[in-house]
């Protein structure tokens, strides 16, 4: 019987209709996995071992009571077969520390998804710059550099490097009178880096989320369409969605980075594509499977767990 630990934000506050971690837990429970619920703050390292104050949990699709804790355990994490790291950004100093702690468990043969070193090494926004599909990009905390970039490329998008869900993303047109205060806010008055990209007008047609499992793309993607007063293609920011088959360029981008993802132990990934550009490689806690499954009648959680079981067989 597979022992699966899932590190996530408090389960008491999730929306089960949308929550990818919950969907994975439901599928794992169907397969009779031992399911251990863990919050990041409850993990600790002591004298060569890594422990967690965890709960053996059961889940059900019930919007009033979707989980119950069966038993509390202080578990040595090397006893688990697989750990899913599903803590949402921001990628802060505590997140960084936990990647070092989890990396230690890999020495005991525990499969961790996604690989802690890669979570640490590959920022979701910056990692796209290694590929030819990235839009024109500036990373800076200098107001002068941002002004210069805007002079060259016109309308721009400014966003923080370590957040999610469209949080603090700004669309700045040329000669926008608010550009100075926006730059001050995002860069903390010139002390923090932010990411600036050329505005891609195809965002009006939607931001495409492509799910990659062990380097292979699902054939349908979640297209998040900004509402009339927005440029952010994030469901958390009020976007609507559609489910569409992958285009030729989507397959091209996916296949181009497939070997990179597999080599780095990035098993469960969400690519964000606007037009023909790769804008993010989501590796911390990719979402979107519930929306895709609502139209594309397949269990994405099942495909993920099938892949995990194959990886466990290879490891053991």
From Swiss-Prot:
Residues 123-309 form the ATP-grasp domain. Keywords: ATP-binding, Glutathione biosynthesis, Ligase, Magnesium, Manganese, Metal-binding, Nucleotide-binding. GO terms for cellular component: cytoplasm. It comes from the Bacteria. It catalyses: gamma-L-glutamyl-L-cysteine + glycine + ATP = glutathione + ADP + phosphate + H(+). Its cofactor is Mg(2+); Mn(2+). Binds 1 Mg(2+) or Mn(2+) ion per subunit. Mg(2+) binds at residues 280, 282. The keyword Magnesium applies. HAMAP family: GSH_S. Belongs to the prokaryotic GSH synthase family. This is Glutathione synthetase. It comes from Wigglesworthia glossinidia brevipalpis. The lineage of its organism: Bacteria, Pseudomonadati, Pseudomonadota, Gammaproteobacteria, Enterobacterales.
